């Protein structure tokens, strides 16, 4: 269903009962947790502004766009009174995270990206939830978001009681860790709000800050995206800085290190969503094998996958860095040499860097 523009609507009968029903319906649709937030995000707006002014967003210009709308839901979607925040876990049953990271000839893909793209799946579930609400109360104004618009989803999740923003800047949940996606439904109904998570439970722990391969955390709760492997391998379009390439290791799409070491993730549970299970053995693939994919193979095997966001050229760029950090084996060297004449200058430069790492000129 196409989202309707928000409109004035009478208060629904028995808001508390409706709020509980919304949470029940959300769980029936596969969400593990549902909370309701108001539209005041308080200090989060100032925190975002300081982060932007420091330049920590790198080339993610969209983070600075839209002005105050990002931190003010009622300005982004006029008429919004509440935000329904929902959590869906994504961790596969057999993660192989430590195993793959410890095997330098393997390609490490962030575990959220191993299955189908979460955007479409969660957006569809949000639409279904809106339809269920509409069947109960009649027409109402709503708009669904899944990491695809200027929404401070982590701040909203904290306000809705889904967890707290940890030192690694991710939302943490005492019963579920941090391996989950977030979705939001902006609504024009004055539903009762849930208690905000106004305390954090990281304590003295600094495991996430200490483990970061590229020292991307400038302090607790402060991430410099320009040094973050997830940013460099997914969002960044240029040549990866030379000084960071050896630190990236075999991480070719995203990074999970600050989640892997988080003590709260011992409570993370495997997802029940089949769509989030690994496809094409990407949880245990060889760097050299992936590097030899043609563009047609890349497009075919990443159809409906988050990996499409990088595109073929940056996919090869990332793999070249991984191969440069891999052992000097015959398959590694042959794969790199096969790409020496690749049309993209970006790819060629990373290939030559990788070959020099192996003593090849």
Swiss-Prot record:
<dbReference type="Pfam" id="PF13484">
    <property type="entry name" value="Fer4_16"/>
</dbReference>
<keyword id="KW-0411">Iron-sulfur</keyword>
<keyword id="KW-0671">Queuosine biosynthesis</keyword>
<dbReference type="Pfam" id="PF08331">
    <property type="entry name" value="QueG_DUF1730"/>
</dbReference>
<keyword id="KW-0408">Iron</keyword>
<dbReference type="InterPro" id="IPR017896">
    <property type="entry name" value="4Fe4S_Fe-S-bd"/>
</dbReference>
<feature type="binding site">
    <location>
        <position position="208"/>
    </location>
    <ligand>
        <name>[4Fe-4S] cluster 1</name>
    </ligand>
</feature>
<protein>
    <recommendedName>
        <fullName>Epoxyqueuosine reductase</fullName>
        <ecNumber>1.17.99.6</ecNumber>
    </recommendedName>
</protein>
<dbReference type="GO" id="GO:0051539">
    <property type="term" value="F:4 iron, 4 sulfur cluster binding"/>
</dbReference>
<keyword id="KW-0560">Oxidoreductase</keyword>
<feature type="binding site">
    <location>
        <position position="202"/>
    </location>
    <ligand>
        <name>[4Fe-4S] cluster 1</name>
    </ligand>
</feature>
<keyword id="KW-0479">Metal-binding</keyword>
<feature type="binding site">
    <location>
        <position position="255"/>
    </location>
    <ligand>
        <name>[4Fe-4S] cluster 2</name>
    </ligand>
</feature>
<dbReference type="GO" id="GO:0005737">
    <property type="term" value="C:cytoplasm"/>
</dbReference>
<feature type="binding site">
    <location>
        <position position="258"/>
    </location>
    <ligand>
        <name>[4Fe-4S] cluster 2</name>
    </ligand>
</feature>
<feature type="domain" description="4Fe-4S ferredoxin-type">
    <location>
        <begin position="193"/>
        <end position="222"/>
    </location>
</feature>
<dbReference type="GO" id="GO:0006400">
    <property type="term" value="P:tRNA modification"/>
</dbReference>
<keyword id="KW-0963">Cytoplasm</keyword>
<comment type="pathway">
    <text>tRNA modification; tRNA-queuosine biosynthesis.</text>
</comment>
<keyword id="KW-0004">4Fe-4S</keyword>
<feature type="binding site">
    <location>
        <position position="205"/>
    </location>
    <ligand>
        <name>[4Fe-4S] cluster 1</name>
    </ligand>
</feature>
<dbReference type="GO" id="GO:0046872">
    <property type="term" value="F:metal ion binding"/>
</dbReference>
<comment type="function">
    <text>Catalyzes the conversion of epoxyqueuosine (oQ) to queuosine (Q), which is a hypermodified base found in the wobble positions of tRNA(Asp), tRNA(Asn), tRNA(His) and tRNA(Tyr).</text>
</comment>
<dbReference type="InterPro" id="IPR004453">
    <property type="entry name" value="QueG"/>
</dbReference>
<feature type="active site" description="Proton donor">
    <location>
        <position position="147"/>
    </location>
</feature>
<comment type="subunit">
    <text>Monomer.</text>
</comment>
<keyword id="KW-0819">tRNA processing</keyword>
<dbReference type="InterPro" id="IPR013542">
    <property type="entry name" value="QueG_DUF1730"/>
</dbReference>
<dbReference type="GO" id="GO:0008616">
    <property type="term" value="P:queuosine biosynthetic process"/>
</dbReference>
<feature type="binding site">
    <location>
        <position position="228"/>
    </location>
    <ligand>
        <name>[4Fe-4S] cluster 2</name>
    </ligand>
</feature>
<comment type="similarity">
    <text>Belongs to the QueG family.</text>
</comment>
<feature type="binding site">
    <location>
        <position position="212"/>
    </location>
    <ligand>
        <name>[4Fe-4S] cluster 2</name>
    </ligand>
</feature>
<feature type="binding site">
    <location>
        <position position="262"/>
    </location>
    <ligand>
        <name>[4Fe-4S] cluster 1</name>
    </ligand>
</feature>
<dbReference type="InterPro" id="IPR017900">
    <property type="entry name" value="4Fe4S_Fe_S_CS"/>
</dbReference>
<dbReference type="GO" id="GO:0052693">
    <property type="term" value="F:epoxyqueuosine reductase activity"/>
</dbReference>
């Amino acid at each position: 269903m196409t989202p309707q523009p928000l409109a004035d609507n009478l208060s629904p009968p028995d808001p508390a009962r409706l709020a509980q029903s919304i949470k029940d319906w959300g769980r029936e649709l596969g969400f593990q947790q549902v909370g309701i937030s108001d539209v005041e995000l308080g200090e989060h707006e100032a925190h975002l502004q300081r982060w932007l002014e420091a330049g920590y967003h790198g080339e993610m210009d969209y983070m600075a766009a839209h002005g105050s709308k990002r931190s003010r839901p009622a300005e982004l979607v006029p008429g919004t009174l509440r935000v329904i925040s929902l959590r869906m876990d994504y961790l596969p049953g057999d993660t192989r995270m430590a195993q793959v990271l410890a095997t330098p000839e393997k390609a490490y893909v962030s575990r959220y990206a191993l299955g189908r793209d979460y955007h479409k799946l969660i957006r569809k579930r949000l639409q279904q939830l809106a339809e269920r609400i509409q069947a109960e109360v009649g027409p109402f104004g709503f708009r669904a978001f899944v990491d695809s618009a200027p929404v401070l989803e982590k701040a909203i999740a904290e306000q809705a009681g889904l967890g707290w923003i940890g030192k690694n800047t991710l939302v943490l949940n005492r019963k579920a860790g941090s391996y989950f996606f977030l979705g939001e439904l902006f609504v024009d109904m004055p539903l009762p709000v849930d208690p905000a998570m106004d305390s954090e439970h990281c304590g003295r722990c600094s495991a996430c800050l200490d483990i970061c391969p590229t020292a991307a955390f400038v302090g607790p709760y402060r991430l410099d995206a320009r040094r973050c492997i997830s940013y460099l391998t997914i969002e960044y379009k240029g040549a990866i800085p030379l000084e960071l390439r050896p630190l990236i290791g075999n991480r070719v799409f995203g990074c999970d290190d600050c989640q892997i070491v988080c003590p709260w993730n011992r409570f993370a549970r495997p997802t029940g969503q089949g769509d989030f299970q690994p496809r094409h053995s990407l949880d245990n693939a060889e760097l050299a094998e992936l590097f030899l994919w043609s563009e047609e193979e890349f497009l075919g095997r990443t159809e409906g996958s988050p990996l499409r966001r990088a595109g073929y050229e940056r996919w090869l760029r990332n793999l070249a860095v991984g191969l440069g950090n891999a052992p000097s084996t015959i398959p590694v060297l042959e794969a790199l040499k096969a790409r020496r004449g690749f049309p993209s200058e970006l790819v060629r430069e990373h290939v030559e860097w990788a070959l020099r790492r192996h003593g090849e000129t």
